[in-house]
UniProtKB/Swiss-Prot annotation:
The keyword Manganese does not apply. PANTHER family: TRNA MODIFICATION GTPASE GTPBP3, TRNA MODIFICATION GTPASE GTPBP3, MITOCHONDRIAL. This is tRNA modification GTPase MnmE. One of its GO terms (cellular component) is cytosol. The keyword Chloroplast does not apply. Its cofactor is K(+).
């Protein structure tokens, strides 16, 4: 067990990156944080008597060496009206790396300890300032990788997820109450009214939340997009076009890329993990063979493959074999490149006649960018997240912990419905309802062990 649950300690941490910058924020919290900090603040008398939610100007003092360390602005908060629910100090100082070290060292000498990662947010949760779902949303916001994931992560801050789960819990509590009354009075001819329709609605809501995580995960972790094809087909030119900068070497000599090159780009708020692979051909040596084997492995694992074909040349053997093996593969987009040159009609006709889904065939030029907009649109329609309707106002699950608990709750609801259908004893129904309520309570934080909280909050960034 870490120091996270030692709430009597006065803690301090840098809340901004440890880099040279115009300003930095050093935050602290604890019952004695204000009097302890006042010992190293020039305007200490005003600080000790000041009300909460006030701002104070002064200097950080090194009393041992009788000198000023920095000119600062101090934000003072008094319990319970603070993020942590405790007395808190936030120091806005100049963003000097040396200055930051000196100020934090003075905090530590004054009786503070360094905060654990996520400790400020944990104290906020324990003080019932925020629900656990909102605490996890803060973590996802901080580490969002794209505009889309950031916008989706903001949604849980409204408390909609908590309200949604609370409604399901209330439905199950009604079952518990009715069963408890029945078992207490043991009236043989009394029938309990089970809210079957409400349980079905709860099942549908849980399934919707589970599906929302699958969409969020794809958006957050990124879509794997692999560029494949024979040598000198234009894969590296297409790779550089996606990135809008040169990363792959573009050359008229075939086989310039012998190993894969990886980069990321964003399209409509979705992160793409892009791979430029070695050209498919009969390998001349061990190094080339390894590169081609890796290319084949990436193609199998990809969410989407763009197979680039040089439509200005005769079709190489490797293209014949690949097209024949993958002509019905829905995750492969065949791109005929170099249409700015003289088109080889036999190559074009063979590809068109072989690929079963004509909409998965695009003609482009990476040189003059003809057909590129069509390619972008096609990529977006081929990615499965486009087929799932998810809006910024929808309730989104962005935590794997929440997802695991929701799947457990969903399985329990299915079991409950099955038992209702089989007309099992009421006490068995009550047990299942109780299990589901506890499961949902773990998501919101109403039911949580110290070990679970410790493991969750230690993954937060320092100062949060």
């Amino acid at each position: 067990m870490s120091n996270l649950f030692q709430r009597d300690d006065d803690i301090v941490a840098l809340a901004t990156p440890f880099l040279s910058s115009a300003l930095c924020v050093i935050r602290s919290s604890g019952a004695s944080s204000i009097p302890k900090f006042s010992k190293i603040f020039s305007n200490h008398s005003a600080l000790n008597s000041a009300p909460g939610n006030t701002i104070h100007y002064g200097y950080i003092l090194d009393n041992e060496n009788n000198c000023k360390v920095d000119e600062v602005v101090v934000c003072l908060y008094r319990a319970p009206k603070s993020f942590t629910g405790q007395d808190s100090i936030e120091v806005i100082a100049h963003g000097s790396v040396i200055g930051i070290k000196k100020i934090i060292d003075l905090f530590l000498k004054s009786g503070f300890r360094m905060a654990e990662p996520g400790e400020f947010t944990l104290r906020s949760f324990l003080a019932k300032k925020i629900a656990l779902t909102k605490a996890e949303a803060l973590h996802e916001i901080i580490f969002a990788t794209t505009n889309k994931t950031y916008s989706l992560a903001v949604t849980p801050l409204s408390g909609a997820l908590f309200a949604n789960l609370d409604a399901i819990q209330r439905c199950l509590l009604n079952i518990l109450s009715a069963v408890s009354a029945y078992l207490d009075y043991e009236v043989d001819d009394h029938e309990i009214s089970i809210p079957f329709d409400l349980i079905l609605n709860s099942k549908a809501e849980l399934k919707k939340l589970i599906n929302s995580y699958k969409v969020y995960e794809k958006i957050d972790h990124g879509v794997t997009l692999v560029l494949a094809g024979s040598v000198n087909a234009g894969k590296s030119s297409l790779f550089n076009m996606f990135l809008k900068k040169d990363r792959s070497i573009v050359s008229s000599y075939p086989g310039t890329t012998r190993d894969y090159i990886e980069a990321t780009f964003e399209l409509d708020g979705i992160l793409f993990n892009l791979f430029d692979t070695a050209g498919l051909k009969d390998a001349d040596n061990f190094v080339e063979r390894l590169g081609i084997e890796k290319s084949n492995s990436l193609i199998k694992e990809a969410s989407l493959v763009i197979y680039v074909i040089d439509v200005s040349s005769n079709l190489p053997r490797e293209d014949f074999l690949f097209i024949d093996s993958n002509k019905s593969n829905s995750k492969i987009l065949f791109v005929l490149n170099k249409i700015d040159l003289n088109i080889n009609k036999s190559t074009e006709e063979f590809v068109r006649s072989s690929v079963l889904n004509s909409s998965n065939l695009i003609m482009i030029s990476t040189k003059n960018l003809e057909g590129i907009d069509i390619l972008y649109d096609k990529i977006k329609t081929l990615i499965s997240y486009e087929r799932v309707e998810i809006g910024l106002d929808d309730i989104i699950i962005s935590s794997s912990r929440q997802m695991q608990l929701l799947e457990k709750a969903y399985a329990l609801v299915l079991d409950l419905l099955n038992k209702i259908d089989r007309q099992v004893s009421y006490d068995m129904l009550a047990f299942d309802a109780y299990e589901i309520i506890n499961c949902l309570g773990e998501i919101t934080g109403e039911v949580s062990s110290e070990d679970v909280l410790d493991n969750m909050f230690k993954n937060f960034c320092l100062g949060k």
